[in-house]
Structure formats: C-alpha cells, structure tokens
Amino acid sequence: TFVFALPSKPDLCRFDPYNRVLKEIDFEKSVGELRLQLRDDDDIAGRQLAAKGLGKKGGIEAAAARETAVMSDRFWAVQAASAKALGEIRTTAARDALFRCLAVRHPKARRGVVAALGQYKGDTEVLDALMPLAKRDRSWFVEAEACRSVGKLRLPGSFEILAANFDRPSFRQVVRAGC
C-alpha cells in the first residue's frame, strides 16, 4: 500500500497511464471520477476502462456519461465500449439512449451500439429500430451485427428478417454469417 500526502483530492488518478505493463487492477472509483476520466483522459485504454467501470455503476448520471461518450469520443473503440456498457444496464432509459446513439457516424461504433441493443430480448421497439439497419446500412458489418441482434431478440418477426437477408451478397458473406 502506498500513501501520498496531497494538498487536495486529485481530479484523476491512473496507474500505468499508457498501459505499458500487462496487468489487471481492481481500483474502485466513484461515478464522478469515472465520468471525468471518460471525458478527459488522453489515453484510449484509460477511457475504455472508465467506460467499463461505468458499466458496473447504475444511475442516470453514469448512463448519461456513457451516451455522451458514444456520441462524442474521439476514438471508435471507446465509443463501442461505452455502448456495450450502456447495453449492460438493460433499462428503458438505457435502451432509449442506445436508440439515440444509432446516429453515431463511425461504423465500428455503430456496430457496438447495435450489438448492445441485442441485449434487450423480447423488446419489439428494439426490433423496429434494428429492422432498417438489417436491411441497409453503409457498412455490411453493421448489417451483420443487426442480423445477429435481431436473432437474439427471439421475437416472432425475427425469422422473416433473417431469412430475407440470408442470400444478400456482401463482403466475404458477413451478412449471411450474421443471420
């Protein structure tokens, strides 16, 4: 255990700032500290860890921070990690935030949002939101993930969507693999 005397509480505390050492750390932080790290950390791995840490926390404040990160972070992997953390909450507020996050520009981040929506089994509103993405998106990988998520929903209309997409041509048949 290390103790450092400081004049005030630090805004941000990081171990191994640029992730140079292979490690697993259990460092409990408050929602405010994680929000600050997710917003202001200059290290991608640090922002991803903050998104993952916020995924373990509940509450409106944590969900809002994750939605903001999905929509505005500089790197797609942080956006995708934030979407995954948002999907783990499985509340209607988180689902509605994920609906808004479908507008994210980067296809890999959008793919993470679509994958997070697949956590809402039996939700017809999610099916309605995923249906247009399964039919047509700028990215075949997003279409494939939409098909996977539609299958996870296990709703009566899911099979028809998957059957319609099964024979669609795509890069390396990724859409077919998603069905």
Question: What residue spans do the PLM features occupy?
Answer:
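Non-catalytic accessory/interaction domains
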Residues: 1-81, 88, 110
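Amphipathic alpha-helical scaffolding segments comprising HEAT/armadillo-like alpha-solenoid repeats
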Residues: 7, 26-38, 59-72, 91-103, ...
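Alpha-helix N-cap/helix-start positions at coil->helix boundaries
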Residues: 43-45, 60, 74-77, 92, ...
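Alpha-solenoid helical repeat scaffolds
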Residues: 49, 65, 81, 97, ...
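Short, intrinsically disordered, charge-balanced linker/junction segments flanking boundaries
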Residues: 70, 106, 167-179
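A generic tandem-repeat structural signature
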Residues: 99-100, 104-123, 141, 148
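Long alpha-helical HEAT/HEAT-like repeat alpha-solenoid scaffolds in very large eukaryotic proteins
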Residues: 137-148, 152-153, 176
